[in-house]
């Protein structure tokens, strides 16, 4: 169970200092500690429209984000408040309150546009807050939406036409919620009641015509319809008599307009119930560290004069996380091998079987923690590191076996060596006595368990080192005839040749086992990669089908409204999505 992060109040995430956007390191520390998936709700709107009040309500607090009580905008840059999600256990709600747009004292439309774009890029639900009704003035104030293609890139290498790039916006843009404060109209058309959502859709209807006025009317509406196919609207009555509005957060509930209280409750309930976890392309859920990386990547891009690019942000994040995934996988492998392996192992195959089990688990850890591993670069690194660690364990195993056998030989054959020095076998019949004793000790050595894979080789080398002793005893033993000595020499040669042959077979067997293990390792990498790619492909297809359904829905609306040309333009986006879905075939080229 991941620990909860519950900030007592908001803190600055991105400062707007002298026209420069600067990330607050303390806020990044908070984000880096949030291991839970995050639901990110951002609110944007003109200054002094009561954005902060709604965000405090979402946090379940009366105070928090600064409301201010004058015509001056209080919030500067983007402020963040992280609280446990009240309706989704094991999730963190991240609320982003933004600097009021259109502040006359600030007079910086450039920064307003960047704050608007950042709020969209960072959130899973984007709330646009405005006063009164949705009229042309309200649409004109929302001109930032028409500038999104000049502020955001979906891909690092889009086509020649920026509109082609913007066609991908839908796949990672947030849900759009328009909140209308101090709304005084009756929600009805031709005497029939309508919902706030109906009112929004009616307000987004296009005007026929190709003149400049029609274009100005249609452009923001088209952008909202194109970029935010999932949209919602809430209207709010006056919260209280005008004289109390400056101190809204201090009012008791009974002093507020009951309709306003009900409307705020409905808004909060919807946002908390329907706002999704922030995701990256392919449905990858965002947690605190991932959100931290997105903030840094986007703000750094803006500061360096580039456009924030979703693809670049994801790839930068993938580099960080995939590198960490390799480290996690290797740590898991070493932990498992440390627990399971007792050196020396009786056979090489015993060690390789333990390696294979630990390797399989390590690859699983990597697959679970990695994403967007372009050309399987990090999986290749993992494979190389696992192979190096396997070889290291093999070396350790050989050394442990050699050390064990050398100590055992000293223990078993030490007394025999002492007898040789004392001349015990330097007498007639001594050679026979020596070879008999040697065979007894060899049998004793063979019977000792868990000597490891070097047992035969260490014994062979030891016996070879004592051949001069045996030969001297043979040649000086007066009880043996020259013929018997010659026969014994030939027997020793044959025995040595047989031992060498067996050693060669043993080495060949080890090489075959290593080659077989390498093939099994490769197949395990391929198997798990194929399964992951299939899961990713299914996720991407589901995401594209969802986007396609929303595009088709919008196309149908345009046709019903009689805007055939706009429908045809949208058809290109639809074809692009359909072609991409067809091309989503798993490709597996690794190692």
From Swiss-Prot:
It is a lipid-anchor. Induction: By IFNG/IFN-gamma during macrophage activation, and by TNF and IL1B. GO terms for biological process: activation of innate immune response; cellular response to interleukin-1; cellular response to lipopolysaccharide; cellular response to tumor necrosis factor; cellular response to type II interferon; cytolysis in another organism; defense response to bacterium; defense response to Gram-positive bacterium. Residues 589-591 form a propeptide. GTP binds at residues 45-52, 181-182, 245. It is found in: Cytoplasmic vesicle membrane; Golgi apparatus membrane; Cytoplasm; Cytoplasm, Perinuclear region. A lipid is attached at residue 588 (S-geranylgeranyl cysteine). (Microbial infection) Ubiquitinated by S.flexneri IpaH9.8, leading to its degradation by the proteasome, thereby preventing its ability to promote host defense against bacterial infection. Isoprenylation is required for proper subcellular location. Residues 35-276 form the GB1/RHD3-type G domain. Residues 1-309 are annotated as: GTPase domain (Globular). Coiled coil: none annotated. One of its GO terms (molecular function) is GTPase activity. CDD domains: GBP, GBP_C. Disulfide bonds: none annotated. Its main location: membrane. Its EC number is 3.6.5.-. The modification Cysteine methyl ester is found at residue 588. Homodimer; homodimerization occurs upon GTP-binding and is required for the association with membranous structures. Heterodimer with other family members, including GBP1, GBP3, GBP4 and GBP5. Belongs to the TRAFAC class dynamin-like GTPase superfamily. GB1/RHD3 GTPase family. GB1 subfamily. This is Guanylate-binding protein 2. The gene is GBP2.
């Amino acid at each position: 169970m991941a620990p909860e992060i519950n900030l007592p109040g908001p803190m600055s995430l991105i400062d707007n200092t002298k026209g420069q956007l600067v990330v607050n390191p303390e806020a990044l520390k908070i984000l880096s500690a949030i291991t839970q998936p995050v639901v990110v709700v951002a609110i944007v709107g003109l200054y002094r429209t009561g954005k902060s009040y709604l965000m405090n309500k979402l946090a379940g607090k009366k105070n928090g984000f600064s409301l201010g009580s004058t015509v001056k905008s209080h919030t500067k840059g983007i402020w963040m408040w992280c609280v446990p999600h009240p309706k989704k256990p094991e999730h963190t709600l991240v609320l982003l309150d933004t600097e009021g747009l259109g502040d006359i004292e600030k007079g910086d439309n450039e920064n307003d546009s960047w704050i608007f774009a950042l709020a969209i890029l960072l959130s899973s639900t984007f709330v646009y807050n405005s006063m009164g009704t949705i009229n042309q003035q309200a649409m004109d104030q929302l001109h930032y939406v028409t500038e999104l293609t000049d502020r955001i890139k979906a891909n690092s290498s889009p086509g020649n036409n920026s509109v082609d790039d913007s066609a991908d916006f839908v796949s990672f843009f947030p849900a759009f919620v328009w909140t209308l404060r101090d709304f005084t109209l009756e929600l009805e058309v031709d005497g029939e009641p309508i919902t706030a959502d109906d009112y929004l859709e009616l307000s987004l209807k296009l005007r026929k015509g190709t003149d400049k006025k029609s274009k100005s009317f249609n452009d923001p509406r088209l952008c909202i319809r194109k970029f935010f196919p999932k949209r919602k609207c809430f209207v709010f009555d006056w919260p209280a008599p005008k004289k109390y509005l400056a101190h809204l957060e201090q009012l008791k509930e009974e002093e507020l307009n009951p309709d306003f209280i009900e409307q705020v409750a409905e808004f909060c309930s919807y946002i908390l119930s329907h706002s999704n976890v922030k995701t990256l392309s392919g449905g990858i859920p965002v947690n605190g560290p991932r959100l931290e990386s997105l903030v840094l990547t986007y703000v750094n891009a803006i500061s360096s004069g580039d456009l924030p690019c979703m693809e670049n942000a994801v790839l930068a994040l993938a580099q960080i996380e995939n590198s960490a995934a390799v480290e996690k996988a290797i740590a898991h492998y070493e932990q498992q091998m440390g627990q399971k392996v007792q050196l020396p192992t009786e056979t090489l195959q015993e060690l390789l079987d333990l390696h294979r089990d630990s390797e399989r688990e390590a690859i699983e850890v990597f697959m679970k923690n990695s994403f967007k591993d372009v050309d399987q670069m990090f999986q290749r690194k993992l494979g190389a590191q696992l192979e190096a660690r396997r070889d290291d364990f093999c070396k350790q195993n050989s050394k442990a076996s050699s050390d064990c056998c050398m100590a055992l030989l000293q223990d078993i054959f030490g007394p025999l060596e002492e007898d040789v020095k004392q001349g015990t076998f330097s007498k007639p019949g001594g050679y026979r006595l020596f070879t008999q004793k040697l065979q007894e000790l060899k049998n004793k050595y063979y019977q000792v368990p868990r000597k490891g894979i070097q047992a035969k080789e260490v014994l062979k080398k030891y016996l070879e080192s004592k051949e001069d002793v045996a030969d001297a005893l043979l040649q000086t033993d007066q009880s043996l005839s020259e013929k018997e000595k010659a026969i014994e020499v030939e027997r020793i040669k044959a025995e040595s040749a047989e031992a060498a042959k067996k050693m060669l077979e043993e080495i060949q067997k080890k090489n075959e086992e290593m080659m077989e293990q390498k093939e099994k390792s490769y197949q395990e990498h391929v198997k798990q990669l194929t399964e992951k790619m299939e899961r990713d492909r299914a996720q991407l297809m589901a995401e594209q089908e969802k986007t396609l359904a929303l595009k088709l829905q919008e196309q149908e609306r345009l046709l019903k409204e009689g805007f055939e040309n706009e429908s045809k333009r949208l058809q290109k986006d639809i074809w692009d999505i359909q072609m991409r879905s067809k091309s989503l075939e798993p490709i597996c080229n690794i190692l």
